[in-house]
Amino acid sequence: MILNKEIETIILVANKNELSFTTENKSTFIYEIGVGKVNALLSLATLYEDIKALGINPVLLNVGTVGCTRYPIGHVLYPNYYAQGDAYTDGFFLENTLFLKGQGVIESVSLDKFDYEEALLTSDRFINVNTAFYQDIKHLNPLAFDMESYALANFCLLKNLPFHSIKIVSDNCDGTVKDWESILGEISGRLGTILDEFMRDRLVKEKIDIPSVS
């Protein structure tokens, strides 16, 4: 499918092979953004130019997998806070750091109003609880870890785009990808149902009329 004026929802996925699903919904567009913050940002910036050229205002929905130490594999998360996961954010570096909140409308909040325990931390690595890096941040007890969401949410804040995310726990940050690899098939099979439920129960509350994707 080609992006067109009929598109109402754009589903952003890091890799179409990671979450393999299709949709016959002509108002839904699936867009691959690549893995990592830089790839995600560059891909979304390119997509944004196409969105502007068409004069449309779609909802952006990021769907993907996360590492999580608090919930079992297969658990579905709807993050409401986003932060850098591997950048130094102390002292004067805080002046250039945004802490983001929201599903739909994204806003920047002060650190004292930011809830790390409900936050998705974005970094360019698989998180391993046995590393020194994790030891430095484990006191924050974050909701989960991914590789794209903060960059996407930040861009949507700057461009005033509606942004939502659905994340599925694929590994428990144990230092291997064995859980991630084995869960992908099960996740792909559930994805259509998960998206339908999300659009019906959450997006409709915002008075956005979006048809089923499954």
Where are these regions (language model features)?
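Active-site-adjacent mobile loop/cap segments within catalytic or ligand-binding domains
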Residues: L140-N141, F145, A151-I187
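Short, well-ordered, mixed-charge alpha-helical segments that flank or form enzyme active sites
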Residues: T69-Y71, D86-A87, I127-N130, N154, ...
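Metabolite-binding pocket within alpha/beta catalytic cores that recognizes anionic/polar moieties
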Residues: M1-Q103, L143
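Regulatory input/activation interfaces that engage signals or partners
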Residues: I168-S214
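Glycine/charged-rich beta-loop-alpha catalytic/anionic-binding loops adjacent to active sites
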Residues: T23-Y31, F133-H139, N172
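Generic hydrophobic alpha-helical segments
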Residues: A40, L44-I51, F133, I187, ...
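Hydrophobic/aromatic beta-strand patches that form the interior of the parallel beta-sheet core
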Residues: Y31, L61, L77, Y116-L121, ...
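Active-site rim beta-loop-alpha module in soluble metabolic enzymes
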Residues: G91-K159
